[in-house]
Design a protein with these regions (language model features):
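Transmembrane alpha-helical segments of integral membrane proteins
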Residues: 87-104
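Hydrophobic cores of alpha-helical transmembrane segments in multi-pass integral membrane proteins
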Residues: 1-16, 38-60, 75-92, 119-136
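Perimembrane loop-to-helix junctions flanking transmembrane segments
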Residues: 21-37
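Short, membrane-exposed interhelical loops at transmembrane-helix boundaries
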Residues: 99-115
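Short acidic alpha-helical/loop segments enriched in Asp/Glu that coordinate divalent cations
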Residues: 17-22, 66-69
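Cytoplasmic juxtamembrane regions at transmembrane-helix boundaries
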Residues: 60-82, 142-145
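Membrane-interfacial segments
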Residues: 19, 64, 95-99, 138-145
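Membrane-water interface of alpha-helical transmembrane segments
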Residues: 33-36, 40, 67-74, 110-120
């Protein structure tokens, strides 16, 4: 959620073209990297990741998980969250939006696109692993309470 808050500030700064701490009389003209649309995606995406983590944490309590299974769910979710943050931030600077390692219909490939794509791919795999562990887990006898 802290990443979402920081991205929200970057969104505001990119929209007004300056760093401002209103109501303080501080207004520093600055060219903020990225675009308002990109910072909006980082802001909302990071917030959704935080909500996903909370939801998975709540749902995991409904199942009997071994230490190893709990670790897969926990680390799979953590890796996915930070991988998504990389995707949102670096995808903003990639002409292909970080959706592939090569050029695509959206634009050409660059380093930012690769830095966006690779962690996101790994995060998708770890999140699938976490969700599969939860789907295969036995319900807890205290799940209803």
């Amino acid at each position: 959620m802290i990443v979402s808050l920081l991205a929200g500030f970057m969104l505001v700064f990119s929209m007004i073209g300056a760093i401002s701490f209103s109501p303080l009389p501080i207004f520093i003209k600055a060219q903020i990297p990225g675009s308002p649309q990109g910072w909006h995606a980082v802001h909302v995406g990071a917030m959704m990741n935080g909500l996903m983590a909370i939801l998975i944490g709540v749902i995991a309590r409904w199942f009997v998980l071994s230490d190893r299974a709990a670790a897969v769910v926990s680390w799979g979710t953590i890796v996915a969250i930070w991988a998504n943050v990389c995707f949102y931030v670096f995808g903003m600077f990639a002409p292909n939006h970080g959706l592939s390692l090569q050029s695509n219909g959206l634009g050409h490939a660059n380093l930012a696109g690769a830095i966006a794509f690779l962690p996101a791919f790994i995060g998708a795999v770890t999140l699938f692993a976490a969700l599969i562990v939860l789907l295969l887990a036995k319900p807890s006898s205290t799940a209803a309470s």
